[in-house]
Amino acid sequence: MRVIKGNKCDWEVVIGLEVHAQVISNSKLFSGASAKTYDAPPNTQVSLFDVAMPGMLPVLNEYCIYQAVKTGIALSCKISKYSAFDRKNYFYPDLPAGYQITQFYYPIATEGKVVLEDHNAKEVRIARIHLEQDAGKSIHEFSQTYIDFNRAGVALMEIVSEPDLRSVEEVAEYLKKLRMILRFIGTCDGDMEKGSFRCDANVSVRPFGSNELGVRSEIKNLNSIRYVMQAIEYEANKQVNILENNEIFTQNTLLFDVSLGQTRVIRTKEDAHDYRYFPDPDLFPVKIDDQYIDHVKSLLPELPLQKRDRYINDFNLNKSDADILSSDKDVAMYFEKVVEKHDARLAASWIIGELFGRLNKLGITIDESSVKAEHLIQLLDLIVDNTISGKIAKQVFDMMFESGKLPALIVSEHGLKQVDDADVLYVVVEKILKDNASKVEEYKQGKEKLFGYFVGQVMKETQGKANPEMVNSIIKQQLESK
C-alpha cells in the first residue's frame, strides 16, 4: 500500500504513530493508588488526587521515571537531562481535574529509532517519549453513562514516531518490534486487548515524489495491529478519493468503526494552542545526570536483536529459528534453560517444531504450558541416552501435555523404553527379511530404496521402540550376508 494508484497521479501514504504504552508500576504516576486496575471493580483503585479533590497535590512516582529512561535507552534515544510536566487543558467527564498532566515542552527522551529488518533495515525515527496520566473510562449503557476512575492517573509513556512509515506492512512491523522491546525490558506488557498498548495513527497522502506533507487525519485509540492496518488503509483510500474529486479535505480526529471497517469524525482536529499548555506549578522539573543514565544502562537486559545475534553466533542457529526464539522474552528464557543442558539445535527443534504446535492447538502461551523447561530437559535426556527414540519421544510429549506427568514416569508406566538388545533386534530383523524374501531379492538387484521399507517394518514390529541406529546396522549386516 506504499502507493495508491489514482486517476490524476500516484499517491504516497505518509503515516506517523503515537503509541500509548502503560508503564509497568505498582502505583500510579502521581498518587499511591494501585496501577493494577484491569480486573478491579469500578472505582476501587482510586485516590483523592485521582478524582481531583480540592487540595490534593501530585507526588511523582520515581519508578515511572526509571521505566521511561530505560525505554528511551532501549530505543536509542537521547535522554533529557531536564524534563518537566505541563498541564494539557480540556474538558471530558473522565478527566476530573479538567486537565491532563503530560510533558509537552520538555519530554523525557528524544531522537530514538526502531529498525524494521523486514523492510531493508529501514529506520523509523522516534521524535519523543513523554510521560503522562491516563484518563478514566466512560461506560455507556442505554441512556446512562458511568465513569470508572480506576485507570485515571495510571502512568503512560507516549512514544511518538516521525511520519516515516509508508505502508501498513511497515506499521505492523514497527508496532510488533516496539512492543517486543518494551516487553523484553519490562516497561510495558504490550497487551493491546487490555488497553495497555494503544495506538493513534496520523495518516495523510501526497502525490508520489512530493516532499510536502498533506493534511492529516488522526485515528484514535486503535487496540489491535489488525485494526490499525485496516483503519489506515481505509482512511488513505478515502483521502485519495476526496483529493481526486477536487474536494476540500480538512484535518479531523477520527474513530475506527470495527463493525463497518470505516473511520468516522468525532471532532475537528485541535492544534496545540487549543489545549493551552502551561507548566504544572505543583511539580518540580526532573533533572537526570549521566551517573543515573549509566546506572539504568547497566541494568538493561539483553535486547531482542542482541539476543538473536548471540543465538546465531554462539549456538549456530539459522536466522529463522533465532528470530523466533528471541522474539518473546518467555520463549527466550525457556530456550536458554534447555540449552544449559542440551545442544541448542536439538532444543530449538523441539521448542519450535513440537512445543509451539501443541501450544497453538491449545491456544496458550509458553508461560502457561504444563510442560516446563525442566520437563523438556528430562525428555531430551531420555533421547540422548537412548532410553527412547525420537518417534517415541513425541508420543511421550503428548502424554506429558495431557497428564502433566514427568517423562521418565510415562516411559515406565507405558513400557516405552527403547529396545537396544542386539539379540532381540536380530530376531526381529531376521523375521522381517524372511517374511519379505521377494523384496530382499529386489533390493539385491539394485532397488536400494527398499532399505527404508525394511527399517519401517522393524519399527512397526517393535511399536517404534527399536533403537534406529542399531536397526539400520543389523539390517545392513543381514542383507550383506544373504
From Swiss-Prot:
It catalyses: L-glutamyl-tRNA(Gln) + L-glutamine + ATP + H2O = L-glutaminyl-tRNA(Gln) + L-glutamate + ADP + phosphate + H(+); L-aspartyl-tRNA(Asn) + L-glutamine + ATP + H2O = L-asparaginyl-tRNA(Asn) + L-glutamate + ADP + phosphate + 2 H(+). Its EC number is 6.3.5.-. One of its GO terms (biological process) is glutaminyl-tRNAGln biosynthesis via transamidation. Gene3D superfamilies: 1.10.10.410, GatB domain, N-terminal subdomain. It comes from the Bacteria. Transmembrane segments: none annotated. Signal peptide: none annotated. InterPro entries: Asn/Gln-tRNA_amidoTrfase_suB/E, Asn/Gln-tRNA_Trfase_suB/E_cat, Asn/Gln_amidotransferase, Asn/Gln_tRNA_amidoTrase-B-like, GatB, GatB_C_1, GatB_Yqey_C_2, Gln-tRNA_amidoTrfase_suB_CS. Keywords: ATP-binding, Ligase, Nucleotide-binding, Protein biosynthesis. One of its GO terms (molecular function) is ATP binding. It holds the Pfam family GatB_Yqey. It is an enzyme of class 6 (ligase). PANTHER family: GLUTAMYL-TRNA GLN AMIDOTRANSFERASE SUBUNIT B MITOCHONDRIAL AND PROKARYOTIC PET112-RELATED, GLUTAMYL-TRNA(GLN) AMIDOTRANSFERASE SUBUNIT B, MITOCHONDRIAL. Belongs to the GatB/GatE family. GatB subfamily. Heterotrimer of A, B and C subunits. Allows the formation of correctly charged Asn-tRNA(Asn) or Gln-tRNA(Gln) through the transamidation of misacylated Asp-tRNA(Asn) or Glu-tRNA(Gln) in organisms which lack either or both of asparaginyl-tRNA or glutaminyl-tRNA synthetases. The reaction takes place in the presence of glutamine and ATP through an activated phospho-Asp-tRNA(Asn) or phospho-Glu-tRNA(Gln). NCBIfam families: gatB (TIGR00133), PRK05477.1-2 (NF004012), PRK05477.1-4 (NF004014), PRK05477.1-5 (NF004015). This is Aspartyl/glutamyl-tRNA(Asn/Gln) amidotransferase subunit B. It comes from Ehrlichia canis (strain Jake). The gene is gatB.
